[in-house]
Amino acid sequence: MPDPTSPKPDWLKVRLPRTDKYGAVKDVIKKYNLNTVCSSAMCPNAFECWDGGCLTFMVLGNTCTRACRFCTVTHGPAGEPLDSNEPQRLAAAAKELDLSYVVITSVDRDDLPDYGAGHYAACIRAVKEQLPGARVEAIIPDFTGRLDLLEQVVDARPDVISHNIETVERLSPSVRDRRAGYYRSLDVLRDVKRVNPHMLTKSSLLLGMGEEDIEIKEALHDLQEARVDIVTLGQYLRPSIRQWPVHRYVAPGEFSELAEYGRSLGFKYVAAGPFVRTSYRAGEQYVSVIADSRMA
């Protein structure tokens, strides 16, 4: 396990923004009183993405009812009252930023009767209405595995639905909240395809939490069997000493090997690298998949 006081490897250095775009994105988020997972989860790509005019909106408030040990998002037994104007504000912000690819994620809301599914679907529809030419990716919670709630989000017609297994099967009970589950997450991904066989699906793994190489490959096989189209693999970076410790730093070469292995399994797209996250360059992932499907 790396010494937490030691410098990180050179490949984990984050570049600072170079243009005024970062500030412009920040101003729009503040103007419309919105949350982003980029800030709430201390994403290492925030500078690069905002500098490029990309961001991931976080809906349903900023308090998660689950407490995964790797995550720095504020958590508690209940979140804030739902803001019925949030879908329209989100869509207005996306329009002002002239986004062609809009990524939406959320906290878990186990305190709500529908776990936030209706509000989430309303956010997707609002973006589709105000930006009919934009693509929308929804990074969803598990909605406790309820198919009727998942259907609400699928029926809002996002272009991609992502749901993350986060880590390998062995570590899932230790790293994720007890209400989450490795196999439940796989079932959610399968259920998306049951509701709409043509929906693109995506999932993500964070590496360096203590997993073995064979376990990563087993997880990739599980995702392939769940008919997932896009997989992302990234380095887990401990937000603070309160979160799960980093067990190792995965070298860029190993990420490249895992990406090649994933492609050999038949995924339509595999993104792997130290800073790769579910929404990292998500628009590029989508364009690549669509382009490849048209050439097939």
From Swiss-Prot:
This enzyme's EC code(s): 2.8.1.8
The protein's location, in the record's own words, is:
Cytoplasm
PROSITE patterns in alphabetical order = RADICAL_SAM (PS51918)
Where does the UniProt entry say this protein principally localizes?
cytoplasm
Coiled-coil spans in chain? none
- InterPro entries the record matches: Aldolase_TIM, Elp3/MiaA/NifB-like_rSAM, Lipoyl_synth, rSAM
The name under which this protein is listed is: Lipoyl synthase
- What does the organism's lineage look like at the top? Archaea, Methanobacteriati, Methanobacteriota, Stenosarchaea group, Methanomicrobia
